[in-house]
A protein has these predicted regions:
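Catalytic-core helical/loop segments in enzymes performing group transfer/polymerization on anionic/lipid-linked
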Residues: 1-522
Length: 522
């Protein structure tokens, strides 16, 4: 029976999703390099003698283990074990496999010629055949997502597997890690686990480079916990470096309270807070083609984040106990941790928090300046480096923890060095002035005091959201520990009630003692 217009449209959409996600078959498998234009032959046990390809293009036999196959001498390569069919199909001119095999099905959906190894006959791979095959995929099984057990359509299953493939591709090739704090190692292990297992932890930088060199693998580092010269040593040794940092939607609680991250970024080119060199995020924002489907996700994600009052450390946060003067512009000035890497590298104008306050006051001498110290500073665990003689520049200093989202609803403008609060303000439609060079500056969305000449593209807010929240970070579902989408983590964070452990409570108490011994802005 011919497919209806609706069925054809849905079949075309499924094929398009599969191509984009590159899932199906053992997509997590190995990726050997083959001769371009070759034939891959995947016999089924007992079928091998039913078809023997003729000599011509190079032929690679793909089997579970070394077989006794009656092939007649045209086999330059033997492929064994789990392999990524998408990588294989990028290189082939033809596939020989049983008609119901994943390799054959994917090849036909891609329009690659397939010969049924059982019958020896070619299988149709024209548009009509591809649509019919896609419709069979749509109708056949029932799919359930692993987070709630609820039934989902095949398209959603493809999207979910696409997230898992992106996760595996991001951490692929990492063989050793160094600089991960002990309390977060188990969580980082979950993030970095790939096809080859968990990358081992090295005790020294020398050991990390030796292991990576032996394995011909990359080393994952936490940049602030390795010597500055480490990357130069790695480059001299030919060892790739993957830099790991917290993601932009981190967790329902602070890292200084030992709450493990539910999101990280893994950057092979640089790091998002260092404007002196490109990063994977900067390249993505500069070059990626953002398809309409992705931008629709970005719009929905942004609206959910804003409506739930979410930020880097989850939801909630009490509104500040302050009434802003109605006859003055209100400017929120965001403080940061003085020795944070993003400040040390991105505060191009210099001066730290004090310089930020001075410039904000010079920019708006008649405005009401509200200064918000960083949560880690208010917790008592980190320092702000704000000189006491600059306190008078602010009309009010928020010396008690309060939510950022409620503040962003009532202020007229936000001034930052490199703080992620500037990005959160953009999500909520605020005017943002960047005194440093954070990842979201230089794309035409902020008022910038410094420039990053590499950033020439003009982005929409939703393109920025798509790159920074949907494509750059990795996420783990807090309930199952499985890789998940940004939308899944946002749903979890929106409904999360922080349940501090004994260790978390002890860290909170320790911070209160430290805070009692010094001003929150010190």
């Amino acid at each position: 029976m011919p497919l209806t217009d609706t069925a054809r449209e849905r079949a075309d959409n499924l094929i398009r999703r599969l191509k984009n996600a590159r899932v199906g078959g053992s997509f997590w498998g190995g990726r050997p390099e083959l001769a371009k234009g070759c034939t891959v032959w995947e016999p089924r046990r007992g079928d091998a003698a039913a078809f023997c390809p003729a000599a011509g293009n190079p032929i690679f036999l793909w089997v579970d283990e070394d077989p006794a196959v009656g092939a007649s001498g045209h086999l330059p390569g033997l492929l064994t074990g789990e392999l990524d069919p998408w990588h294989l199909l990028d290189q082939v001119a033809q596939v020989v496999a049983p008609a119901d095999d994943a390799l054959a099905i994917i090849a036909r959906l891609l329009g690659i010629p397939v010969i049924d190894s059982v019958t020896g006959k070619p299988l149709a791979h024209d548009l009509r055949a591809r649509r019919s095959l896609a419709w069979q995929v749509l109708e056949a099984p029932t799919y359930r997502e692993p987070f709630t057990g609820s039934e989902i359509p095949p398209e959603a299953a493809i999207d979910l597997l696409g997230e898992w493939r992106r996760h595996l591709d991001t951490v692929g090739g990492i063989g050793v890690q160094f600089g991960m704090r002990g309390w977060k190692r188990s969580q980082i292990d979950r993030f970095l686990t790939g096809v080859s297992g968990v990358p081992r932890h090295a005790r020294t930088t020398r050991a990390a480079l030796e292991v990576a060199g032996t394995k011909q693998a990359a080393v994952a580092i936490w940049p602030s916990r390795v010597p500055l010269e480490f990357e130069a040593r790695a480059a001299a040794s030919g060892v790739p470096v993957a830099r790991v940092e917290d993601g932009f939607l981190r967790s329902p609680g602070l890292g200084v309270h030992l709450v493990p991250p539910q999101s990280i970024i893994v950057d092979r080119e640089g790091i998002h807070y260092d404007p002196a060199r490109p990063s994977d995020l900067e390249r993505l924002l500069a070059e990626h083609r953002f398809p309409p489907e992705l931008l629709c996700r970005a719009v929905a994600l942004r609206m959910t984040i804003v409506s739930a009052g979410l930020g880097k450390y989850g939801s909630g946060g009490k509104p500040p106990a302050i009434v802003l003067p109605p006859d003055r512009r209100s400017i929120l000035v965001i403080g940061q941790v003085a020795d944070d890497r993003s400040v040390l590298m991105g505060d191009v104008a210099g001066g730290g928090n004090a310089g930020l306050l001075e410039r904000a006051r010079a920019h708006a001498p008649d405005a009401f300046l509200l200064y918000k110290p960083h949560p880690d500073v208010l917790s008592g665990h980190r320092r702000a480096g704000l000189r006491r003689e600059t306190h008078h520049l602010a009309d009010h200093i928020l010396n008690r923890p309060c939510g950022l989202a409620p503040l962003l609803k009532v202020v007229d403008e936000v001034h930052v060095l490199t703080s992620l609060a500037g990005f959160e303000a953009l999500l909520r439609g605020c005017d943002v002035m960047c005194h440093g060079a954070p990842f979201y500056a230089g794309w035409g969305l902020t008022h910038d005091l410094v420039s990053v000449p590499r950033r020439k593209r003009r982005l929409t807010l939703d393109q920025l959201v798509a790159g920074a929240l949907l494509l750059y970070p990795l996420y783990l579902d807090p309930d199952t520990g499985l890789p998940c989408s940004a939308e899944r983590l946002v749903a979890r964070l929106a409904g999360a009630t922080p349940r501090p452990s004994l260790v978390n409570r002890l860290r909170l108490f320790e911070g209160l003692i430290r805070r009692a011994l010094r001003p929150a802005t010190a």
